[in-house]
Amino acid sequence: MKTILMAALTLVSYATYAHAQDAAAGEKVFVQCRACHLVGDKAKNGVGPLLNGLFGRKSGTIEGYTYSDANKNSGIVWDEAVFAEYIQNPRAKIPGTKMIYAGLKDEQRIKDLTAFLKQFDASGKKAQ
C-alpha cells in the first residue's frame, strides 16, 4: 500500500511539474515574437507595442504606439486567460487587430511565454 501511495504521489508531482510555467522556456518561445515586440528596460515600440507590464494593462494603451481601433476599443484587460486565448488566434479574439501572427497553438508554450512576459513590470525591470 505504501508503495502504491508513493508511486501515485510521484506521478502527481511529475504531472504538476510537466504543466508548470517555465520562464526560461518562454524566453525561447519569445524569440519568434521579437520580430515585432520587445521587453526589458531598453524596450521600445516597434512593429508591435512593447510588452513590459502586459498583465493587468488595458489593451491599446501603450503610449507612442498606433493601435487599431479594434484593440483600443476591445475593452480587454490582459490576464493569463485572455492572453492565452488571444495568442492562439489574435484575429479571432480581436477582429480588426493589426497583429498578423497566425497564433501559438501549444498550451505549454503559451504557459511558458506567459511566465516569461510576467517577469517584466511596466518599467521593463525583470523580477528576480
Where are these predicted regions, by residue range?
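Periplasmic/extracellular electron-transfer cofactor-ligation site
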Residues: 21-66, 72-77, 88-95, 120-128
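Sec-dependent signal peptide recognition
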Residues: 1-7
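Sec/Tat signal peptide C-region and signal peptidase I cleavage site
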Residues: 14-22
